[in-house]
UniProtKB/Swiss-Prot annotation:
It comes from the Bacteria. This is Ribonuclease HII. It comes from Neisseria meningitidis serogroup C / serotype 2a (strain ATCC 700532 / DSM 15464 / FAM18). PROSITE patterns: RNASE_H_2. One of its GO terms (biological process) is DNA replication, removal of RNA primer. CDD domains: RNase_HII_bacteria_HII_like (cd07182). Endonuclease that specifically degrades the RNA of RNA-DNA hybrids.
């Protein structure tokens, strides 16, 4: 008998701006998607194509997020756990078991769960969740780039690159920036002085 298993992964823990995303995915018993692996090992074009195939073939999937305010009030780890719980809670079908990428399990899932280090390279459901979380996170960065093109979010995806730090210096901190992350916090403190 096939056990309904969900894979859960996150995207966007390290950037200085935007939400942290998590996805939960339940795949059918027979599922083969050549090239599906950890989203970080895939080109953007391949990720986007795989994301559509995953959404079309999954038994259930859900993407959720925790925003910059939640990251600031909870810290990035707890905000990530919150996004993961939201992703699981949003599934239209309740899984019997959950595999979560990493070494921590969100509280109050009420479903048997197991943390799997490097699970996005080992368990296909986690690989699928990795792709959905990353494509959702990238979509947020493209939308932010449309509103604030001078920051280059479409290129660096919110990470603390030289280009991003220079834009922060020149244009200041946006409401979407994570004010508790050191480079942003330091600039925000400087701006508050003037």
């Amino acid at each position: 008998m096939h056990i309904l298993t969900a894979g859960v992964d996150e995207a966007g823990r390290g950037p200085l701006v935007g939400s942290v995303f998590a996805a939960a995915v339940i795949l059918p018993e027979i599922f083969d998607l050549p090239g599906l692996t950890d989203s970080k090992k895939l080109s953007e074009k391949k990720r986007d194509a795989l994301a559509e195939m995953i959404k079309n073939q999954a038994v259930a999937w859900h993407v959720a997020a925790a925003g910059p305010e939640e990251i600031a009030s909870l810290n990035i780890l707890h905000a990530t756990m919150l996004a993961m719980k939201r992703a699981v809670d949003g599934l239209a079908v309740r899984p019997e078991k959950i595999f979560i990428d990493g070494n921590r399990i969100p509280e109050h899932l009420n479903i048997p769960a197991e943390a799997v280090v490097k699970g996005d390279s080992k368990i296909i459901e986690i690989s699928a969740a990795s792709v959905l979380a990353k494509t959702a996170r990238d979509a947020e960065m493209y939308a932010l780039a449309q509103r604030h093109p001078q920051y280059g979010f479409d290129k660096h995806k919110g990470y603390g690159t030289k280009q991003h730090l220079e834009a922060l210096e020149k244009y200041g901190v946006l409401p979407e920036h994570r004010r508790d992350f050191a480079p942003v916090r330091n600039l925000f403190a400087q701006q508050a002085l003037f």
